[in-house]
Amino acid sequence: MKITNDNAATINYWLAIVEPFLTSDEDRNSDDIIRKFRAVVAEHGDTEEVDPEVFFAIFSILATKYGRVYSKKVEELNESLKAAILAGAEAEDLRNKLKDISQRYASQLEITADREQQLESLKKKGHEQPLTGSGSSEPVHAESAHAPQLHVVNDLQQFYIPFNEYPSLTQSIGTSDIANDEHLKRVQLTLKITDTKVFSRTGFEFAISCGSRSTSDKDPYDGIIKISGKSHMRKDIAYAIRTSGITVRQFCAAFANLYWNFNLARNTPPENWRKKGFTEGTKFAAFDFFYAVGSNAAIPTEADGSVRLIRPPTNEENEANSAMRYADIYEQNSKTAGHVTSSPLYNRGSSYESKNKAKLLEM
């Protein structure tokens, strides 16, 4: 039987084949996934050509299904916890259940993200070989052996270093767009917080509050942050940051990896994502220091100094956040550049566009 999109409606059949690839945390090597898929297909008795697009389509459907199930459970437990707290009832059991389901949800998101990356990589390769149960394939015809070859001349070849002579990477990683350790230490000193852990928590709480609001100089930074029995005015923290030689956005960018995982684990996007024009599929990217997510120059998520995101941002999230930042710039400049509208649709390509690119991180 040849499996095509026409008979893929037998969802139970495909569920049995594809679901293990969605839920298993083993074997993240993208080079092995199709081989294992072929083996599973063979176990189900199909030895003829398999349309890979069927696998991709069903996988996407199942990933969405799992996400909705976990999201609903988290939402229900959150509501139950709120009701219990309001009623003054014991809520420790609910908290533990919420923590457990949130961790499982985060793990599922991570597995799904890994699988999506693997499958996307495989799709880009073109799948010149058909997916069959036996793993056999037709030979790919190469171009003529007599085709002219391009010879590349590199003027920097004199500086070539063999791989086995590469120096060990010990220098600090940094970028001007993200606050470094010296910047953070200056802010800590200005705030007179001697305990680094307390300062880290204070900084993270501040970044969380900015994620749902803004890191702009125009923001009033009203509100109070309480850590370890001590209160800090948000405007005082913002002042300490600016007087330390960095912007609030650069400071918050240092916490971008933590903030990203924090929101995904709780399934809670920045509060004002709708107001900023983000969609349901891009709402987690609705904060203005999003550009630092995944950067090794930001605070790591792991104790060994590595960065491990629950899932990486999608292309749609990257594009939506980039569009938001450009829209903010156009709106700001249209007030002084003589434009009758701030819409990027009408103003894009104006003479001041390239100049404004440098201002993306200054807003």
Swiss-Prot record:
A Pfam family hit: Flexi_CP
Please list the GO terms describing molecular function: structural molecule activity
Which UniProt keywords are listed?
Capsid protein, Coiled coil, Helical capsid protein, Virion
The name of this protein is: Capsid protein
Q: Which GO terms describe its cellular component?
A: helical viral capsid
The uppermost taxa in this organism's lineage are: Viruses, Riboviria, Orthornavirae, Kitrinoviricota, Alsuviricetes
Task: Give the location in the cell.
Answer: Virion
Where do the segments described as Disordered lie? 122-144
Residue ranges annotated as transmembrane are none
Organism's domain of life?
Viruses
Where primarily located?
virion
Which regions form coiled coils?
72-111
Species of provenance = Citrus leaf blotch virus (isolate Nagami kumquat/France/SRA-153/1984)
